[in-house]
């Protein structure tokens, strides 16, 4: 089933809609300390103004969709930090409020700007902007590296996962997000749990499933991307399916495999290609692609069938600006040396 929201949105976006880039890694670049099981959700407590600023930076560099700082924000995770269920729920709602504040501020700046922007380098353009509520995997909550392997052990069943995610999904949907973004889905078990949960709770907010891969054929657990894509295709609540937090070099092949099993829009937002050490909790130096190289893939991704394109970990507002420029003008952007 196609969603009027996503159909109309993509029609207005043109060639493809632009998704914001990395949130947690961009917060770190702004000085936030994310050495915590809550990761970027820690900033909901310590520096919400930084989250708002990063959202705004992405909007001013061409993003059409911003994603809430709730990837690793769970009621269970907040409870482990000493918060009550009610306080945890309030922090989830706050992640949506912050994104909405950034969108409102962006629209205000658009209204205040001159039509030609003069020498203003910001992209101030009145357009539909969607807020996607981020839902991270069960492995992201565990913060033990299993989000990168998809190996939860035999004791974890679909019911376990549904019960874990249920309240968070309800809160994000009730908070007024435009979309639910199920991100870095590592295995078919969790994908099926999400699909069943959306149906059981009759969630009316449209959703996308974005899987993560490290080889161009399978999700990180080893389950085939086609199997996982078929789960998304069979769920009427899911309006787009794709890949995130995966090296850019694998994306083209993954799009082609997904196109075999789904007619839904394809959503693509890879990471920079840098290697993350889940034990040391740090990114490998000089292991990724430059912004120029990242953006050079965009034409091929869109020609292969991608309808929504952005970035994940270690991509920046500059990356997103490059994507915006190549989609809006067809010209390869230039990047300043860093």
Swiss-Prot record:
Keywords: Metal-binding, Methyltransferase, Transferase, Zinc. It is an enzyme of class 2 (transferase). Residues 1-327 form the Hcy-binding domain. Its cofactor is Zn(2+). One of its GO terms (molecular function) is selenocysteine methyltransferase activity. Optimum pH is 6.0. Present in all tissues tested. It catalyses: S-methyl-L-methionine + L-selenocysteine = Se-methyl-L-selenocysteine + L-methionine + H(+). The keyword Methyltransferase applies. GO terms for biological process: methionine biosynthetic process; methylation; S-methylmethionine cycle. Zn(2+) binds at residues 245, 312-313. It holds the Pfam family S-methyl_trans. Monomer. Catalyzes the methylation of selenocysteine with S-methylmethionine as donor. Does not methylate cysteine. This is Selenocysteine methyltransferase. The gene is SMTA.
